[in-house]
């Protein structure tokens, strides 16, 4: 019986890769321990508690294991490596390295300091030059505001002419004592003065010139001539009435 069964079994061709369950049930791997599957001092299912938590259900050994099995085997197949990154570190026997910590978030104060101040100009740009204010751009008659001012035109301050301005005005007065509107505008732009200042200066200069040359004032002369003409016109009718009265008196005496 033994030989016949052996001959029958010898003709039977086993598959090249039989399932692991047949090896376990037949008792071919009875003397293998847990170290054979783990490859180290630690078990095959060892996982770091921090990264890969163990499942709640327990591991159950196969029910058909033959006598002589060293320890309970996992549900995975024969010689199968544990899946996942934890299995690689468990086989080598080294602890799993901790994952790299994320970079710290920047503080709001540091972010504000890193940004450039908008009030400060960039270092590459030059500072803005102040605007140039020419003398003719300035207002000559500037008076402080008086809150107690009731009305009327405020008193204007006296204009101080420079030597250059007086020299140019004297030259112009030497050639023309009276200026046209166009010429007055040209002189005002040239000397950085207003038209009113040019007009007043020429009026005062003409009065001084007449006083130096002892010439009568044209305004006083015209007023005196008008008064004399009015007096002569008022005396003429009275002289005409006197002869008429004398003739009338002689006529009455003759009667």
From Swiss-Prot:
Annotated region (Disordered), positions in chain: 31-128, 212-255
User: Could you cite one Gene Ontology molecular function of this protein?
Assistant: DNA-binding transcription factor activity, RNA polymerase II-specific
Q: Where is the composition biased (Pro residues)?
A: 96-107
- Residue ranges annotated as compositionally biased, kind Basic and acidic residues, are 245-255
State the CDD domains in the record.
Answer: homeodomain
Indicate yes or no for the key word Transcription regulation: yes
* Compartments, record wording: Nucleus
Q: Determine the domain of life of the protein's source.
A: Eukaryota
Q: Which GO terms describe its cellular component?
A: nucleoplasm
GO biological process assignments: anterior/posterior pattern specification; embryonic skeletal system morphogenesis; positive regulation of transcription by RNA polymerase II
- Residue numbers of the DNA-binding region are 154-213
Place the motif Antp-type hexapeptide on the sequence.
Answer: 133-138
Low complexity biased stretches: 222-234
For this UniProt record, the keywords arranged alphabetically read as follows:
Developmental protein, DNA-binding, Homeobox, Nucleus, Transcription, Transcription regulation
Complex formation: Forms a DNA-binding heterodimer with transcription factor PBX1.
What is the annotated role of this protein in its UniProt record?
Sequence-specific transcription factor which is part of a developmental regulatory system that provides cells with specific positional identities on the anterior-posterior axis.
Q: Which family does it belong to?
A: Belongs to the Antp homeobox family. Deformed subfamily.
Can you name this protein? Homeobox protein Hox-D4
Q: Which species expresses this protein natively? A: Saguinus labiatus (Red-chested mustached tamarin)
């Amino acid at each position: 019986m033994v030989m016949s069964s052996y001959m029958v079994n010898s003709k039977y061709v086993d598959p090249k890769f039989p399932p692991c369950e047949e090896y376990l049930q037949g008792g071919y791997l009875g003397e293998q321990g847990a170290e054979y599957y783990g490859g180290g001092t630690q078990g095959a299912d060892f996982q770091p508690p921090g990264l890969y938590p163990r499942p709640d259900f327990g591991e159950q050994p196969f029910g058909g294991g033959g006598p002589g099995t060293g320890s309970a085997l996992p549900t995975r197949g024969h010689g199968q490596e544990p899946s996942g990154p934890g299995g690689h570190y468990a086989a080598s026997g080294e602890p799993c390295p901790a994952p790299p910590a994320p970079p710290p978030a920047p503080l709001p104060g540091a972010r504000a300091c890193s940004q450039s101040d908008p009030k400060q100009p960039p270092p590459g740009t030059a500072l803005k030059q102040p605007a140039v204010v020419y003398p003719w751009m300035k207002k000559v008659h500037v008076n402080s505001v008086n809150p107690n001012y009731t009305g009327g035109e405020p008193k204007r301050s006296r204009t101080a002419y420079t030597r250059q301005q007086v020299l140019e005005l004297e030259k112009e007065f030497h050639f023309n004592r009276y200026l046209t509107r166009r010429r007055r505008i040209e002189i005002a732009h040239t000397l950085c003065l207003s038209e009113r200042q040019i007009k007043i200066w020429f009026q005062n200069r003409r009065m001084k010139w007449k006083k130096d040359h002892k010439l009568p004032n044209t305004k006083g002369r015209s007023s005196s001539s008008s008064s004399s003409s009015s007096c002569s016109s008022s005396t003429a009718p009275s002289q005409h009435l006197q002869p008429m009265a004398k003739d009338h008196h002689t006529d009455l005496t003759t009667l």
